[in-house]
């Protein structure tokens, strides 16, 4: 089988490529150039798409004895990931750019080009398990990335490979060292690659500008402060609110809702964050078939968030989710990923983009 190995320059994708070679596949390595402007992506060992990473990926390919290329996806990345990120925050939403990159770049634009060139699959270093179209959590629960892959369709998964998902991260590093890969001890990347400063608010402000609004008490409606734009806030945020003192009940204040049309940011105590129901649009069902009737499942609403038991039902191209227990910090624009518990690793059932939430009166 001809396999295109997406090599980010990190240890996981290097070992993924190595395992594809060891499995007897005809492997070609490729690194994605994602910025047309030098210096706009992070440089150094902590980046996931920096200039240094391209060199690390090339050296890993040399060790493996496979051809290596750098493909320019800067325009697509800007349009589908960066511009989407900015527009979502301007609309009072909280997007996940890594998730969007998987959906639109790695397993769409990149995979489409790979298939057009005669490749059968794209291998990446994601921590997830995939077999016969079934996407599961990784063996290493701390590194599991099934959440950011939960937006992939059955067709996209049919041409994907995740060779490292069945192995703990520590063992992957050991294997990299055994194979003579210099990236064996390279630190993991954690931040957003196109915000090298790590200052998301400044990045967004430079692109959106000042759009004044008010910070309002969620219970009393009192105006507590003014702000320069809803893009500086996300649901559950506690710091940087521009408000002095706790809520009326003596508890810390959090962002509880964002109203982009009026520029209103409401803040309140933690109880104001609790939701019992989630509505999502852009539903994707991993099996390719939309389920009929209610589905018992667990849901995850953040990349490193916990699971909550729920009942989900497909509704008009979206998903209606009723939670067994309240969740906090649920924001529009986030992905909600549905799982079915399984001893071999929880199975991804599907996902949607959160478009609304609701709470029972007694939780307010």
From Swiss-Prot:
Disulfide bonds join 101-193. Keywords: ATP-binding, Cytoplasm, Disulfide bond, Nucleotide-binding, RNA-binding, Transferase, tRNA processing, tRNA-binding. It comes from the Bacteria. The active site is at residues 101, 193. The record marks 126, 334 as: Interaction with tRNA. It is found in: Cytoplasm. ATP binds at residues 6-13, 32, 125. Its EC number is 2.8.1.13. The keyword Glycoprotein does not apply. GO terms for molecular function: ATP binding; tRNA binding; tRNA-uridine 2-sulfurtransferase activity. Pfam families: tRNA_Me_trans (PF03054), tRNA_Me_trans_C (PF20258), tRNA_Me_trans_M (PF20259). It catalyses: S-sulfanyl-L-cysteinyl-[protein] + uridine(34) in tRNA + AH2 + ATP = 2-thiouridine(34) in tRNA + L-cysteinyl-[protein] + A + AMP + diphosphate + H(+). GO terms for biological process: tRNA wobble position uridine thiolation. Signal peptide: none annotated. Residues 143-145 are annotated as: Interaction with tRNA. GO terms for cellular component: cytoplasm. Gene3D superfamilies: Adenine nucleotide alpha hydrolases-like domains, HUPs, Translation factors. HAMAP family: tRNA_thiouridyl_MnmA (MF_00144). Belongs to the MnmA/TRMU family. Catalyzes the 2-thiolation of uridine at the wobble position (U34) of tRNA, leading to the formation of s(2)U34. This is tRNA-specific 2-thiouridylase MnmA.
């Amino acid at each position: 089988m001809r396999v295109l190995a997406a090599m980010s320059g990190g240890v996981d994708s290097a070992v993924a490529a190595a395992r594809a070679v060891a499995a007897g596949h005809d492997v070609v390595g490729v690194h994605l150039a994602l910025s047309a402007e030098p210096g706009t992506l992070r440089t150094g060992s902590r980046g996931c798409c920096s200039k240094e990473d391209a060199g690390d990926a090339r050296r890993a390919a040399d060790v493996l004895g496979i051809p290596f290329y750098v493909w320019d996806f800067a325009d697509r990345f800007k349009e589908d990931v960066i511009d989407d990120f900015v527009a979502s925050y301007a609309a009072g939403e909280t997007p996940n750019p890594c998730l969007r990159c998987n959906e639109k770049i790695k397993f769409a634009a990149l995979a489409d080009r790979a298939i057009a060139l005669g490749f059968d699959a794209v291998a990446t270093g994601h921590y997830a398990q995939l077999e016969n179209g079934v996407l599961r959590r990784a063996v290493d629960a701390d590194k599991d990335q099934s959440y950011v892959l939960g937006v992939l369709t059955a067709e996209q998964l049919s041409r994907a490979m995740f060779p490292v998902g069945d192995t703990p991260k520590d063992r992957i590093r050991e294997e990299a060292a055994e194979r003579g890969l210099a990236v064996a001890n390279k630190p993991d990347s954690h931040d957003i690659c196109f915000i090298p400063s790590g200052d998301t608010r400044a990045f967004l402000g430079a692109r959106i500008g000042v759009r004044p609004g008010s910070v309002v008490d969620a219970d009393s409606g009192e105006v507590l402060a003014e702000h320069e734009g809803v893009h500086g806030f996300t649901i559950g945020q506690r710091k940087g609110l521009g408000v002095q003192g706790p809520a009326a009940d003596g508890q810390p204040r959090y962002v509880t809702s964002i109203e982009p049309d009026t520029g209103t940011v409401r803040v309140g105590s933690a109880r104001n964050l609790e939701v019992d129901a989630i509505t999502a649009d852009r539903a994707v069902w991993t099996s390719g078939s939309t389920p009929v009737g209610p589905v018992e499942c667990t849901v995850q609403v953040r990349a490193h968030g916990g699971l909550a038991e729920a009942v989900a039902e497909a509704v008009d191209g979206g998903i209606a989710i009723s939670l067994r227990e309240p969740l906090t910090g649920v924001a529009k624009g986030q992905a909600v990923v549905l799982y079915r518990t399984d001893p071999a690793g929880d199975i991804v059932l599907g996902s949607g983009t959160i478009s609304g939430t609701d709470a029972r009166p007694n939780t307010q």
